[in-house]
């Protein structure tokens, strides 16, 4: 008699099945149903078959925060090096001189691009950077009202609300004018003694390049100016530091980081020197070691894991160090002339896109100049029909801002990759659909 039979006999049962008789069959473990084992080459064949179902080669006219841009292969090579790829937040920072230097270089590059005094080591993404900026403004002046443009996307507003609700801060929207730009009179009427900060976007949520942001420093009174910018656009547009921004933030995905579904992004935050000790996250600085050699250190690390919770400025945990390396590498490879070229190509292709759609009767909502995202008047929801033709595009504004008065507004996006051939394919598809 084998061991199992002996145990069954001792227990007075006939099979192991009786041990689980009180467990319903519907919740018991079953065969997974993946079939028998395959040889290596057959596994690869199966994987390729599944991969072929992906829609990776579709023409892309999507944007509104995440963009399809050219990424130099050198960027991918650098961030794939195991010394960086496997690194976590350096808790003994001086040991990780390479990682610290890469963050220091990133901070320097962004500060130069934004024309701001300091840049922190990173935030999670652009939206969380906005939330942290609002909290930073509260720490600076103790006031409880934030003014944001009506072109702010609902998802961004939701994150902002989540960040400031514990401070009992009030979020109030100001109007945009018929050009899709800041309504200066309306904004000015809302700024009072309780206003902690005015948030501006350039380009804004309508995709419009808004020169009215240059006037805000004249009317903001004692409140702070928080500027949410597109880093690629700064290749040609005036940087936030040159129009009086106290805090400048951005989503850094465009700087050498691929598009992804639920993966990591990069929150950029820069600020004036006066506010450095109110800033969240970490700040890497340059010093010298005991031998007088150049060394890098965590100059500030005011998060709750490092200092007393009551004194911490943020509970941000892991920084986005690998993505700051990608952004720093991207900016270093392109240089100022390369970034300017990418920005100019983006504007050129956006203009070509608008003219081409205009030729078939699809007009822009605003006559103003757009950067990447352009809002068109299209009553029909064309997104699914375009997808069937291998084209991604046609985001409805009301899917981004539910109560927007521009119900017919539909976005199409251009980058440096959007050449005339791709635009022609979109035009041909829309002519059939419309």
UniProtKB/Swiss-Prot annotation:
GO biological process: glycine decarboxylation via glycine cleavage system; nucleoside metabolic process
Segments passing through the bilayer: none
Gene3D superfamilies: Aspartate Aminotransferase, domain 1, Type I PLP-dependent aspartate aminotransferase-like (Major domain)
EC number in record: 1.4.4.2
InterPro entries: GcvPA (IPR023010), GDC-P_N (IPR049315), PyrdxlP-dep_Trfase (IPR015424), PyrdxlP-dep_Trfase_major (IPR015421), PyrdxlP-dep_Trfase_small (IPR015422)
Catalytic activity line of the entry: N(6)-[(R)-lipoyl]-L-lysyl-[glycine-cleavage complex H protein] + glycine + H(+) = N(6)-[(R)-S(8)-aminomethyldihydrolipoyl]-L-lysyl-[glycine-cleavage complex H protein] + CO2
Pfam families: GDC-P
A Gene Ontology molecular function term of the record: glycine dehydrogenase (decarboxylating) activity
Record's keyword terms, sorted: Oxidoreductase
Disulfide pairings: none
Family in the record: Belongs to the GcvP family. N-terminal subunit subfamily.
Functional description taken from the UniProt entry: The glycine cleavage system catalyzes the degradation of glycine. The P protein binds the alpha-amino group of glycine through its pyridoxal phosphate cofactor; CO(2) is released and the remaining methylamine moiety is then transferred to the lipoamide cofactor of the H protein.
Subunit description: The glycine cleavage system is composed of four proteins: P, T, L and H. In this organism, the P 'protein' is a heterodimer of two subunits.
Protein known as: Probable glycine dehydrogenase (decarboxylating) subunit 1
Organism: Thermoplasma volcanium (strain ATCC 51530 / DSM 4299 / JCM 9571 / NBRC 15438 / GSS1)
């Amino acid at each position: 008699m084998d061991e199992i039979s002996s145990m069954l006999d001792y227990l007075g049962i006939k099979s192991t099945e009786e041990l689980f008789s009180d467990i319903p069959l519907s919740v018991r473990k079953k065969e997974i149903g993946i079939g028998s084992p395959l040889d290596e080459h057959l596994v690869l064949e199966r994987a390729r078959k599944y991969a072929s179902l992906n829609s990776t080669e579709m023409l892309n006219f999507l944007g509104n925060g995440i963009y399809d841009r050219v990424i130099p292969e050198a960027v991918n090579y650098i961030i794939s090096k195991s010394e960086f790829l496997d690194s976590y937040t350096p808790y003994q920072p001086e040991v990780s001189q390479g990682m610290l230097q890469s963050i220091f270089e990133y901070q320097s590059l962004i500060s130069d691009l934004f024309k701001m005094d300091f840049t922190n080591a990173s935030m999670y993404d652009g939206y969380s950077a906005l939330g942290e900026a609002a909290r930073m403004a509260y720490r600076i002046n103790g006031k409880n009202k934030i003014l944001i443009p009506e072109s702010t996307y609902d998802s961004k507003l939701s994150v902002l609300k989540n960040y400031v609700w514990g401070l009992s801060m009030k979020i109030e929207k100001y109007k945009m004018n018929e050009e899709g730009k800041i309504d200066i009179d309306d904004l000015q009427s809302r700024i009072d003694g309780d206003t902690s900060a005015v948030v501006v976007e350039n380009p804004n949520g309508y995709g419009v390049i808004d020169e009215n942001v240059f006037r805000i420093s004249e009317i903001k009174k004692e409140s702070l100016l928080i500027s949410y910018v597109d880093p690629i656009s700064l290749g040609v547009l005036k940087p936030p530091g040159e129009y009086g921004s106290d805090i400048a933030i951005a989503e850094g995905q465009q700087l050498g980081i691929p598009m992804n579904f639920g993966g990591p992004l990069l929150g950029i935050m820069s600020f004036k020197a006066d506010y450095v000790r109110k800033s969240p996250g970490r700040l890497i600085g340059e010093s010298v070691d005991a031998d007088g050699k150049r060394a890098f250190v965590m100059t500030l690390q005011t998060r709750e894991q490092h200092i007393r919770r009551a004194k911490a400025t943020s509970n941000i945990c892991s920084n986005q160090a690998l993505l700051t390396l990608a952004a720093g590498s991207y900016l270093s490879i392109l240089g100022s002339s390369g970034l300017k070229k990418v920005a100019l190509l983006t504007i050129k292709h956006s203009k070509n896109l608008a003219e081409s759609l205009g030729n078939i009767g699809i007009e822009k909502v605003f006559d103003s100049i757009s950067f990447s995202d352009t809002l068109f008047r299209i009553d029909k929801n064309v997104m699914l029909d375009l997808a069937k033709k291998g084209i991604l595009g046609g985001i409805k504004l009301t899917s981004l801002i539910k109560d927007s008065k521009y119900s017919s507004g539909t976005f199409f996006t251009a980058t440096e990759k959007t050449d005339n051939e791709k635009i022609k394919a979109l035009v041909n598809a829309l002519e059939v659909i419309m």
